[in-house]
């Protein structure tokens, strides 16, 4: 059985089929065009450069294309890269199903739906419960398929739902420790805070930003969705405004993308839960590709740090 891309070590030779996740054009210092491609399989992704590309070659190597690539693994400024020696588009009789090359959440979709449904069932505030159920039902198919981001954390198929399920479990544990928290508000905030990403992002594979995503962003999108849902359900109550605020403020600061800082206790806690789960996902995945006694590659979204895996951790 062939190794997955995340299992290769620096210096090893690679000769595998991979999926182009993204392809970005650049101009080298010598004035010649090149492509930066992110190649992936179910274990993760890796960056590679294609130098001196012609317009014809550029048209070949686009997102969602399966390629056969040979080369070697190198460490460039703390980041693992694939140095390409040979590359070609795969033939139809070699590989056919793109889904075989994408990373997926480690939990089944039906299990995640069941858990989220149980959290909604536990809500006692009818306005919060109705709004949350309505919006989840409206976007459920995309919610269960989409990643939580294009990069950095939970950027895999069903990553959005997996992120929410993990956050709900965190919210429950924190609410049990601090009973003054409004569980209904916190659970609803967790479920709704990133739901706008089903409109912001293009889909589960080779994910990019939509026009709405670029011009509005998932926070503004979801604030509007909550308002529309309240109108449709004829809910005219303060819960609507508080839920909108929780979504609006969940990034914490204006420089991080939130027009308002958290001004409600549950909004503050949601911000920390979101941040904690995202960072844990980044660290766990980086450390999962690292041997005991060694450092991870640099994690850009965590201040470009390399994390050490203790030698006694298997």
Swiss-Prot record:
CDD domains documented for this protein: HDc, YhaM_OBF_like
GO terms classed as biological process: rRNA 3'-end processing
Top-level taxon of origin: Bacteria
SUPFAM superfamilies recorded: HD-domain/PDEase-like, Nucleic acid-binding proteins
Entry-linked InterPro entries: 3'-5'_exoribonuclease_YhaM, HD/PDEase_dom, HD_domain, NA-bd_OB-fold, NA-bd_OB_tRNA, YhaM_exoribonuc/phosphodiest
GO molecular function, one term: 3'-5'-RNA exonuclease activity
Pfam family, one: tRNA_anti-codon
EC code: 3.1.-.-
Keyword Isomerase: no
Listed Gene3D superfamilies: Hypothetical protein af1432, Nucleic acid-binding proteins
Keywords assigned by UniProt, alphabetized: Exonuclease, Hydrolase, Nuclease
All residue ranges annotated as the HD domain in the record: 163-279
Similarity field: Belongs to the YhaM family.
Biological function: Shows a 3'-5' exoribonuclease activity.
Name of this chain's protein: 3'-5' exoribonuclease YhaM
Annotated organism of origin: Bacillus cereus (strain 03BB102)
């Amino acid at each position: 059985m062939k190794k997955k891309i995340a299992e290769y070590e620096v210096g090893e030779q690679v000769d595998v089929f991979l999926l182009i996740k993204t392809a970005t054009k650049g101009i080298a210092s010598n004035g010649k065009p090149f492509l930066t491609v992110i190649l992936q399989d179910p274990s993760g992704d890796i960056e590679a450069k294609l130098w001196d590309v012609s317009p014809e070659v550029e048209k070949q190597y686009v997102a969602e294309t399966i390629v056969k690539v040979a080369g070697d693994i190198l460490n460039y400024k703390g980041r693992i890269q694939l140095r390409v020696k040979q590359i070609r588009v795969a033939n139809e009789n070699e590989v056919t199903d793109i889904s075989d090359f994408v990373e997926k959440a480690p939990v089944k979709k039906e299990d995640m739906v069941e858990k989220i449904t149980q959290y909604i069932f536990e809500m006692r505030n009818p306005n919060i419960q109705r709004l949350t159920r309505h919006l989840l039902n409206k976007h459920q198919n995309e919610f269960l398929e989409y990643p939580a981001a294009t990069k950095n954390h939970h950027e895999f198929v069903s990553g959005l739902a997996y992120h929410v399920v993990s956050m709900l479990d965190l919210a429950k544990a924190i609410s049990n420790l601090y009973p003054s928290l409004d569980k209904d508000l916190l659970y609803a905030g967790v479920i709704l805070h990133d739901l706008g990403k089903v409109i912001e992002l293009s889909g589960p594979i080779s994910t990019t930003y939509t026009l709405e995503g670029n011009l509005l962003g998932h926070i503004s999108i979801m604030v509007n969705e909550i308002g529309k849902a309240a109108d449709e359900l004829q809910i005219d109550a303060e819960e609507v405004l508080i839920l909108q605020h929780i979504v609006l403020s969940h990034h914490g600061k204006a420089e991080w993308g939130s027009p308002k800082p958290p001004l409600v206790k549950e909004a503050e806690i949601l911000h920390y839960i979101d941040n904690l789960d995202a960072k844990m996902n980044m660290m766990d995945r980086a450390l999962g590709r690292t041997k005991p006694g060694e450092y991870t590659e640099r994690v850009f979204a965590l201040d470009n740090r390399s994390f050490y895996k203790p030698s006694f951790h298997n």
